[in-house]
Regions:
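Left-handed beta-helix
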Residues: 79, 85, 90-91, 96-105, ...
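Right-handed parallel beta-helix
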Residues: 127-130
Length: 202
């Protein structure tokens, strides 16, 4: 009975995700409408297939779970986006550009999450403290391009904006704007590089 209730809850969540990310309108949910949008709108197909694969992976066994893994491998190859199926992402996911996105399977991410190209949400790989992996990101979080969130345990609050080219390895409070300060350094060479000089001489 408990397992059935959990499955029903997961199915309702799946439908809400597809409503917001694939249908993207106020019409009532129906599978024909979702499938029609997935076929008609190529930019929405990733959301459709990843949500289906995620649901199968987390709620099914045997053939469907293996099918979910195959679907996700194909999505990774086609879109250059690797979101592990263990990741739990609430409705409203927005991927501005797909290339180079990686999200670890331990991530738990809230509603209306926006992520951009060449961004990684991952773990250190060493975990010297041996504590359980926990990557938690709140609601209404936006991450700029070319950013990295790397930690074995981290909490990012609600309504956080992370600027492009940021490195995050510490907790962030609610309602914060975060950037990693960068310094542009330009030096003028005193001599012409050897490889360019040899080309000009020839």
């Amino acid at each position: 009975m408990l397992m059935k209730a959990q499955t029903d809850k997961s199915l309702l969540l799946l439908k809400e995700c597809l409503q917001k990310e694939v249908m993207m309108n106020a019409k009532s949910f129906s599978w024909p409408r979702v499938i029609h949008k997935a076929i008609k709108c190529p930019r929405r197909r990733y959301y459709f297939w990843w949500r289906i694969a995620s649901y199968w992976y987390q709620n099914k066994t045997g053939f469907l779970k293996q099918a979910a893994l195959r679907i996700n491998r194909k999505l990774t190859l086609k879109y250059g986006t690797e979101i592990e199926l263990g990741a739990r992402i609430m409705p409203g996911l927005v991927i501005s550009h797909h290339q180079g996105i990686v999200i670890n399977g331990s991530a738990v991410i809230g509603h209306s999450f926006r992520i951009r190209q060449n961004t990684t949400i991952g773990i250190t790989g060493s975990n010297p403290s041996k504590l359980p992996i926990s990557i938690r990101i709140g609601n209404n979080v936006s991450i700029g391009a070319n950013s990295c969130i790397i930690a074995d345990q981290i909490i990012i609050g609600d309504n956080v904006v992370i600027g492009a080219m940021s490195f995050i390895n510490k907790d962030l409070p609610d309602n914060s704007n975060v950037i990693t300060e960068k310094t542009l350094r330009i030096t003028v060479r005193e001599t012409e590089p050897q490889d360019l000089k040899s080309v000009s001489d020839s």
